[in-house]
């Protein structure tokens, strides 16, 4: 068939790694070749808010959220591989982006 690229993102790296392990196991069972998981750079979003609702701008609080990402390339995916990927029960915290690529 063709190559399939999966990009997975999550706030918790442990949930992300468990999901990646389940995908890798399902793909290897179908006999397709897999490249990865490739860890992508962690994106950090920082937010600064005032502690006081009215005055005192010197008093601020900072929050951050980290977005962890992994990438998988499935080489020579078969219809059986695609079927096993659609039947996987993935964690709801993980965002999965699927892109079919040419040979």
UniProtKB/Swiss-Prot annotation:
GO terms for cellular component: ribonucleoprotein complex; ribosome. It comes from the Bacteria. The keyword Endoplasmic reticulum does not apply. InterPro entries: Ribosomal_uS10 (IPR001848), Ribosomal_uS10_CS (IPR018268), Ribosomal_uS10_dom (IPR027486), Ribosomal_uS10_dom_sf (IPR036838). Keywords: Ribonucleoprotein, Ribosomal protein. One of its GO terms (molecular function) is structural constituent of ribosome. PROSITE patterns: RIBOSOMAL_S10 (PS00361). It holds the Pfam family Ribosomal_S10. One of its GO terms (biological process) is translation. The keyword Kinase does not apply. Part of the 30S ribosomal subunit. PANTHER family: 30S RIBOSOMAL PROTEIN S10 FAMILY MEMBER. NCBIfam families: PRK00596.1, rpsJ_bact. Belongs to the universal ribosomal protein uS10 family. Involved in the binding of tRNA to the ribosomes. This is Small ribosomal subunit protein uS10.
């Amino acid at each position: 068939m063709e190559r399939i690229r999966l990009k997975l993102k999550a706030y918790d790296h442990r949930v992300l790694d468990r999901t990646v392990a389940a995908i890798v196991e399902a793909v290897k069972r179908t006999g397709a070749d897999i490249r990865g998981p490739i860890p992508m750079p962690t994106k950090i979003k920082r937010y600064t808010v005032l502690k006081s609702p009215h005055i005192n701008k010197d008093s601020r609080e900072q929050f951050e959220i980290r977005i962890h990402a992994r990438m998988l390339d499935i080489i020579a995916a078969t219809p059986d591989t695609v079927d096993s990927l659609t039947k996987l029960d993935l964690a709801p915290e993980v965002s999965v982006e699927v892109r079919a690529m040419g040979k």
